[in-house]
Amino acid sequence: MAVGNGVLLHIARSLMLFFHVQKLVQYLWMNSRRHRLPPGPIGWPVLGALPLLGTMPHVALANMAKKYGPVMYLKVGSCGLAVASTPEAAKAFLKTLDMNFSNRPPNAGATHLAYNAQDMVFADYGPRWKLLRKLSNIHILGGKALQGWEEVRKKELGYMLYAMAESGRHGQPVVVSEMLTYAMANMLGQVMLSKRVFGSQGSESNEFKDMVVELMTVAGYFNIGDFIPSIAWMDLQGIQGGMKRLHKKFDALLTRLLEEHTASAHERKGSPDFLDFVVANRDNSEGERLHTVNIKALLLNMFTAGTDTSSSVIEWALAELLKNPIILKRAQEEMDGVIGRDRRFLEADISKLPYLQAICKEAFRKHPSTPLNLPRIASQACEVNGHYIPKGTRLSVNIWAIGRDPSLWENPNEFNPDRFLERKNAKIDPRGNDFELIPFGAGRRICAGTRLGILLVEYILGTLVHSFDWELPSSVIELNMDEPFGLALQKAVPLAAMVTPRLPLHIYCP
């Protein structure tokens, strides 16, 4: 039976009314949710909350969280910023909503330092990132890969022990960060490029250390241009200019290393290193291809994050042990009981030393290498703890605040490894599943070097504590524990200490 025109007109009107009502309901729903943004401070005109962050944003944000709660929303320039300051809030963003927050927002560091986000750290979550991550895990960062270059770590640490023992023999203080950078850069150079980057600890390795520290510092700055893109070209703080100058230095170094690696290819026949492996597998099944710029950017990630983040935690841990000699002595007694004093500390010893592991966890808690996780951005609007988070909102997880939360940690400003020997905290692990302790982040964008970072902290710190007695130079009345803000938390004043060998002298010979 034919349908009359009147019926069709009625259906059309009903459909139009339905769609209009649907749009109205959606509009009202969205607007009602906008009024349910997470609480946060009222910022300045144009700049928003930027001036409120000061020179120590992680501390300022931790103080704001005491007033506004575990999830805050700040208008920073023209951008929205959500800040998570408790384990529960961090878990909501980094686990429950992990996929929605799997990309990085555009920023000057990615553009001017990381080859326009052609690296693994700042790349969007997609085929190129997956390829870089896969290659890194297979050959250098995964569990099986780490076992494969254990001897390299042992050998390079031997060179460092010898240099430190020589400093002690001549009555000279050891500058810890310089020694660590020298050793770690050479470890990575051996496995990535089949060469020691620095022949000896000196001006060249110290210059590299200064470059790494500068990169990790400027990359952590809150750059006005990142939050008010319309004025980014003005570079009001001079940050972008500094990044460009620093990038030229790193690019020259990486270019030289790649050229030397190509020239020595005949020496590695049958023994490919990480770079050979990457070049041989630069194409994947999804049609993604790694170009020279991607390889440079990946090496930059490895050399900077691989040397700085772990070394800063080790330096902080040693500083805390010097301030707490009872803890230092107890750690040495544990090692003497398990290892003795007739051989070096080995990686296999770590699992038998619960107090050392507790010291490392306490260092990760109190001095996380990255106080604010690398920023992420919401791909879609979402809801967290009943609050509306708009699409395009940037996310910052305050790892430092979680580690200093008195509701989680008794006397959080004290360095007390025993807290990780107590029943409720004994099983807490820093690998990203226990949100009370996430020094490397969590979720699919967790630091790719998490396994390596934890291993280096435990192995190198354990070796240094077992191998030497430590004390401050006589000229130091009180140890400076100040921390300037950056992508990684450095000591404002590098730790310099006197060391005395505890083991037979032949053990220190490389």
UniProtKB/Swiss-Prot annotation:
Catalytic EC class: oxidoreductase
Pathway assigned in UniProt: Pigment biosynthesis; anthocyanin biosynthesis
Alphabetical keyword list: Heme, Iron, Metal-binding, Monooxygenase, NADP, Oxidoreductase
InterPro entries: Cyt_P450 (IPR001128), Cyt_P450_CS (IPR017972), Cyt_P450_E_grp-I (IPR002401), Cyt_P450_sf (IPR036396)
Binding site for heme: C447
Keyword match Heme: yes
SUPFAM superfamilies named among the record's database cross-references: Cytochrome P450 (SSF48264)
Catalytic reaction equation(s): a 3',5'-unsubstituted flavanone + 2 reduced [NADPH--hemoprotein reductase] + 2 O2 = a 3',5'-dihydroxyflavanone + 2 oxidized [NADPH--hemoprotein reductase] + 2 H2O + 2 H(+)
Keyword field contains Cell division: no
Cofactor(s) required for function per UniProt: heme
Regions crossing the membrane: none
Record function comment: Catalyzes the 3'5'-hydroxylation of naringenin and eriodictyol to form 5,7,3,'4',5'-pentahydroxyflavanone and 3',5'-hydroxylation of dihydrokaempferol and dihydroquercetin to form dihydromyricetin.
PANTHER family: CYTOCHROME P450 98A9, FLAVONOID 3'-MONOOXYGENASE
Family recorded in the similarity comment: Belongs to the cytochrome P450 family.
Protein name: Flavonoid 3',5'-hydroxylase
Natural source organism: Eustoma exaltatum subsp. russellianum
Gene: CYP75A5
